[in-house]
């Protein structure tokens, strides 16, 4: 006997401070809900396959990163136009302005408008006419 008393406590009160429960998101250092993403993964699986907790954490981290990236670029677009609210137009400008995000997000954004673009061949003709006068 070591004289330390009960080593393995049962259901009785412990002298140690009880640990408060922490969410999966807090443990992973994320803002997006890991538990909800895991639930969606399990629910949408074809053959009710098992989903590991690390898969849900990884997917949540990727979603959070992409969201932060798009919001940062859209915020910069809104700031350039001197407005304080991000609109679908700012999202469109941010996504289409970044080559990698443009390749990733092929969706049409409602009320996003179009990007201003004039073909270079047309610009050269206009400049030549101005030079001749």
Curated annotation (Swiss-Prot):
Pfam families: Histone, Histone_H2A_C. One of its GO terms (biological process) is silent mating-type cassette heterochromatin formation. GO terms for cellular component: euchromatin; nucleosome; nucleus. The modification N-acetylserine is found at residue 2. It is found in: Nucleus; Chromosome. Keywords: Acetylation, Activator, Chromatin regulator, Chromosome, DNA-binding, Nucleosome core, Nucleus, Transcription, Transcription regulation. The keyword DNA-binding applies. Belongs to the histone H2A family. This is Histone H2A.Z. It comes from Candida albicans (strain SC5314 / ATCC MYA-2876) (Yeast). The gene is HTZ1.
């Amino acid at each position: 006997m070591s004289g330390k008393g009960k080593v393995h406590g049962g259901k009785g009160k412990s002298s140690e401070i009880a640990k408060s429960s922490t969410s999966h998101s807090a443990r992973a250092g994320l803002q997006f809900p890991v538990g909800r993403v895991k639930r969606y993964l399990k629910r949408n699986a074809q053959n009710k396959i098992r989903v590991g907790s690390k898969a849900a954490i990884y997917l949540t981290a990727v979603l959070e990163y992409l969201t932060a990236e798009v919001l940062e670029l859209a915020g910069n677009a809104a700031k350039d136009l001197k407005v304080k609210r991000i609109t679908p137009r700012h999202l469109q400008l941010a996504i289409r302005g970044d080559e990698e995000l443009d390749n990733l997000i092929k969706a049409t954004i409602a009320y996003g408008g179009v990007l201003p673009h004039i073909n270079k061949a047309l610009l050269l003709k206009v400049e030549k006419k101005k030079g001749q006068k």
